[in-house]
Amino acid sequence: MIQMQTNLDVADNSGARRVQCIKVLGGSKRKYASVGDIIVVSVKEAIPRGRVKKGDVRKAVVVRTAKEVRREDGTAIRFDRNAAVILNNNNEPIGTRIFGPVVRELRAKNFMKIISLAPEVL
């Protein structure tokens, strides 16, 4: 469950290390984002010579949340930290590698590139 001002780790090699959610996309009254939702983020911490710089405002997709995600078969999955992948204007990842596991729910939301780059899909 991601809302405005939530800090997230970045799960790709775009150059950003930490980002902060500044908007949840999907309607003016929408308060929370979960796995597979697109948010607008501000880069708070970045590595030198990365593709994104500190202060950049970008779109990102949430790939891991500390709040559990319920599935139709009754199981739930949760992670230790919140994480996101930075996207370009075509909703494709900026980075060429994904770090850590991602959830199956991304497949239903057509983030196939992230699914294929991820080392593990839970």
UniProtKB/Swiss-Prot annotation:
Gene3D superfamilies (UniProt xref): Ribosomal protein L14
Cellular component aspect of the GO annotation: cytosolic large ribosomal subunit
Keywords, in A-Z order: Ribonucleoprotein, Ribosomal protein, RNA-binding, rRNA-binding
PROSITE patterns tied to this protein: RIBOSOMAL_L14
SMART domains for this protein: Ribosomal_L14
Functional description taken from the UniProt entry: Binds to 23S rRNA. Forms part of two intersubunit bridges in the 70S ribosome.
GO molecular function, one term: large ribosomal subunit rRNA binding
Subunit structure: Part of the 50S ribosomal subunit. Forms a cluster with proteins L3 and L19. In the 70S ribosome, L14 and L19 interact and together make contacts with the 16S rRNA in bridges B5 and B8.
One Pfam family cited in the UniProt record for this chain: Ribosomal_L14
The protein's name: Large ribosomal subunit protein uL14
GO biological process: translation
Family assignment from sequence similarity: Belongs to the universal ribosomal protein uL14 family.
Species this chain originates from: Dinoroseobacter shibae (strain DSM 16493 / NCIMB 14021 / DFL 12)
Superkingdom of origin: Bacteria
